[in-house]
């Protein structure tokens, strides 16, 4: 069947958008953000408890080897993300965002709570790490479908002149979810004696995921489908093969998004997963001190994101992207050197500056605006799922390997800097997306603007 013009979809979506009450928009924003926060809380726990999980599931290895094995399992979730991204994007672009996002949240909550119930290596031998791998893969499938769907939902509900503001809150809840996971780990580490924390304390944080997930699920089930997807449905324009259509019609957008997400994901995981554990096992800083500084950095990123998003509504997406990427290019190596010293003031300053740079990027709105509504869930999920799997999930294990092989503490920082150079090239190729209707054209073929 012949598809309607993108401008026709844009006009229909705009008509539905104008009829959408402001409280419905607020509910949709809350549904996306609360669920997103819960899912990233779930995901952050594994990295925050990496040293304890290494002892629980890989007790025979030396501390560095056990940490490497734990980070390898950490990467399993990222490798599973493309499967979740493709699965949920297929149904999200065919049937709607709402139900796909409800299932991703429920899956994430159940498998995270399952990690809290796992027996240790001393009880069941190698079955314990095998089950850990299985549940981490389940986390990856759930989170693989979350980011693209929540970004699509937020941007499609937002008024055209406030998409950056809405997307900024979606990006902020990524940082807030990670911060909540780290804060929970830090609180338990500070309040429980060592034996109690190792025996059962860490499990409480994982079990908390289930009631939190059910709250988020309740909120998500109370919203309507987005105005943009309602327009696609009414016009009979829903894609039958969203993935194939995305690869055929939006290859350049996928490449640009891939390069940007690869840099962000790797940088996030090097600074917020690898470095705190590395500082702890090398004795340069207690884990609680490193986690506290990382927590402050995430809160700074969360605070910066909505402000940067609102600013991008006024000056455009590309200026904010350029500012954030150049800041990371200049700061990653020197701030890693500062953090590696383990001094309280240096840790705090380093994580604040990294948080500001990452918070400024606000990629959610920009990436969502690159793709047409009928392919948005697939485009976002494909870009995010593949980039985070290949570069984000492997970053902690690769960073650990690089330090062990080269003896250079800054090797992971140089790796992240190399990815930042690639991201700069992608930003240069990207069009300005602010202010235009979501389906009004302006693809990459028209070249950068703004």
What does each model-identified segment do?
Residues 47, 251-300, 392-396:
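Extracytoplasmic gate region of multi-pass secondary transporters
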Residues 50-83:
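Extracellular/periplasmic helix-loop-helix junction of adjacent transmembrane segments
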Residues 85-97, 305-317:
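Helix-to-loop junctions at the C-terminal end of transmembrane segments
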Residues 94-106, 314-325:
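Cytoplasmic membrane-interface "Motif A"-like loop-to-helix N-cap segments
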Residues 106-124, 326-341:
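C-terminal ends and interior cores of transmembrane alpha-helices
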Residues 165-189, 212, 383-395:
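Glycine-rich segments within core transmembrane alpha-helices of 12-TM secondary carriers
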Residues 216-223, 366, 418-444:
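Multi-pass alpha-helical transporter architecture, strongest
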Residues 318-363:
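C-terminal transmembrane helical hairpin of 12-TM major facilitator-type secondary transporters
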């Amino acid at each position: 069947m012949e598809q309607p013009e993108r401008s026709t979809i844009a006009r229909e979506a705009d008509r539905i958008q104008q009829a959408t009450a402001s409280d419905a928009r607020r509910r949709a924003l809350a549904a996306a953000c609360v669920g997103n926060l819960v899912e990233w809380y779930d995901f952050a726990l594994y990295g925050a408890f990496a040293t304890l999980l290494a002892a629980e599931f890989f007790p025979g290895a030396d501390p560095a080897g056990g940490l490497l094995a734990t980070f390898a399992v950490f990467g399993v979730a990222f490798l599973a993300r493309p499967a979740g991204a493709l699965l949920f994007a297929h149904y999200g672009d065919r049937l709607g965002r709402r139900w796909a996002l409800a299932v991703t949240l429920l899956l994430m909550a159940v498998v995270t709570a399952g990690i809290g119930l796992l027996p240790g290596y001393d009880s069941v031998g190698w079955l314990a790490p095998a089950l850990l791998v299985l549940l981490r893969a389940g986390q990856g499938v759930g989170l693989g479908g979350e980011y693209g769907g929540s970004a699509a939902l937020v941007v499609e509900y937002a008024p055209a002149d406030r998409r950056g503001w809405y997307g900024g809150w979606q990006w902020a809840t990524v940082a807030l979810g990670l911060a909540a996971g780290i804060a929970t780990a830090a609180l338990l580490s500070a309040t429980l004696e060592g034996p109690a924390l190792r025996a059962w304390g860490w499990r409480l944080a994982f079990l908390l995921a289930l009631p939190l997930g059910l709250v988020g699920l309740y909120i998500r089930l109370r919203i309507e489908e987005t105005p943009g997807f309602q327009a696609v449905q009414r016009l009979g324009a829903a894609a039958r093969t969203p993935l194939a259509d995305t690869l055929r019609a939006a290859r350049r957008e996928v490449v640009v998004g891939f390069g940007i997400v690869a840099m962000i994901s790797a940088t996030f995981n090097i600074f917020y997963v690898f470095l705190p554990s590395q500082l702890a096992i090398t004795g340069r800083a207690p884990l609680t001190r490193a986690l506290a500084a990382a927590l402050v950095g995430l809160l700074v990123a969360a605070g910066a994101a909505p402000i940067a998003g609102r600013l991008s509504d006024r000056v455009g997406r590309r200026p904010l992207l350029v500012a954030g990427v150049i800041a990371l290019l200049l700061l990653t190596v020197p701030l890693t050197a500062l953090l590696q010293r383990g001094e309280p003031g240096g840790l705090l300053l380093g994580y604040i500056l990294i948080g500001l740079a990452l918070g400024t990027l606000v990629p959610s709105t920009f990436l969502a605006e690159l793709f047409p509504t009928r392919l948005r869930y697939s485009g976002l999920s494909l870009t995010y799922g593949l980039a985070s799997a290949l570069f984000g999930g492997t970053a902690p294990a690769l960073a650990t390997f690089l330090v062990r092989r080269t003896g250079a503490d800054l090797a992971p920082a140089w790796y992240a800097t190399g990815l930042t150079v690639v991201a700069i090239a992608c930003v240069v190729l990207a069009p300005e997306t602010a202010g235009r209707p979501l389906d009004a054209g302006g693809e990459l073929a028209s070249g950068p603007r703004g």
